[in-house]
Amino acid sequence: VKAEPIVRPLSEFGLISDNRVAVEAMLDFHTLPAPTLISRADAVFVTVADLDDLGEWLRARGGIVHVSSAGDGLELWTLLTTTPTRADGSSVPVRVSVPVPMGESVMAYIRAAVAA
């Protein structure tokens, strides 16, 4: 008789903690700007200072950029990306955002990543 371990799903707190650890481990390897990091059960949200920082994330991790109105003459540019794939095949969604004044000049490679 062979005993099989029982794998219990993580609690919401466990998911939040696991996601944060995954992103922090990635940041140890990639050294990307992440001045504000908020972990949730479904994703980790990073707010960066400017478009140059968003560009660093895009070059390192790839992904799709979404642009939405943030009101008062601002747009919110958000990169949808993930951590590298873990041993179990999973990855953590990462949302990297920066507020940008409407009409601001944006680098071509970032514009090219904007979802149609």
Where are these regions (language model features)?
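Structured alpha/beta or helical-core interaction and ligand-binding surfaces enriched in interleaved
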Residues: 1-116
